[in-house]
């Protein structure tokens, strides 16, 4: 498993590992991005209605993935039950693409994603409002309590993997700039101030769990990669 906040380079690292094992060990590596298993826009709206908070309209936190499908996909890959079809999520349209990715072989499986490997948040930290989104839109803690309870079920997925790499950022303030840079690339844009404002609001959905992981994941991961302010590797700690 590989985890890290937005813009930390977890997808790039996954690809590098895949190339390494193919070149030197002739192994077929399958990369599963937890992002590809997001629920559709309509499914999230139904979830928001069911849980009585429109915060679940926005993809991101646990609850907004098709966890059942993701676990089934991992199990099929492990059992060599090929071909295995993996969904592809389009973040621009905020929905799954019509076509899937077909996998015929898997010697190694990498699961990468921003919340991968996270343990549930403790009650004290969960209760604390760390941004305006929580303070204004989740005063009764309906949203954060629901996704934190869902995170308990996510442990069934995480426990299927035996190696955990965590990428730690120097500070949360860098996330918005790195995410902005990433999104400009996806949209082939040079600059978009409106997009930056939207991203500032968007990353608040990820802030609590990301900060919680920065506090807890360094103690449970197998490899800790610390980045500097320029997105460069500052330190690698093997455990």
Regions found by a protein language model. Give the residues of each.
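Short hydrophobic/aromatic beta-strand immediately N-terminal to the Walker A/P-loop
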Residues: 1-3
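Loop/turn-to-beta-strand initiation segments
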Residues: 82-84, 105-109, 163
């Amino acid at each position: 498993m590989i985890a890290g906040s937005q813009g930390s380079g977890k997808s790039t690292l996954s690809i590098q590992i895949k190339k390494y094992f193919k070149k030197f060990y002739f192994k077929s590596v399958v990369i599963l991005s937890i992002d590809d298993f997001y629920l559709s826009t309509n499914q999230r709206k139904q979830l928001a209605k069911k849980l009585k908070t429109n915060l679940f309209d926005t993809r991101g936190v646990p609850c907004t993935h098709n966890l059942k499908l993701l676990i089934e996909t991992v199990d099929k890959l492990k059992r060599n039950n090929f071909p295995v079809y993996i969904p592809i999520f389009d973040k621009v349209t905020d929905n799954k693409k019509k076509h899937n990715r077909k996998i015929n072989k898997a010697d190694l499986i990498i699961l990468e994603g921003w919340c991968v490997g996270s343990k549930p948040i403790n009650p004290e930290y969960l209760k604390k409002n760390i941004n305006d989104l929580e303070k204004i839109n989740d005063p009764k803690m309906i949203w954060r309590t629901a996704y934190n309870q869902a995170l308990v079920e996510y442990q069934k997925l995480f426990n299927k993997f035996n190696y955990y790499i965590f990428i730690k950022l120097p500070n949360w303030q860098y996330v918005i700039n790195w995410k902005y840079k990433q999104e400009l690339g996806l949209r082939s844009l040079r600059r978009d101030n409106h997009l930056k404002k939207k991203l500032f609001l968007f990353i608040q959905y990820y802030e609590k769990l990301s900060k919680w992981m920065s506090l807890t994941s360094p103690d449970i991961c197998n490899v800790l990669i610390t980045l500097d302010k320029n997105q460069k590797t500052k330190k690698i700690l093997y455990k």
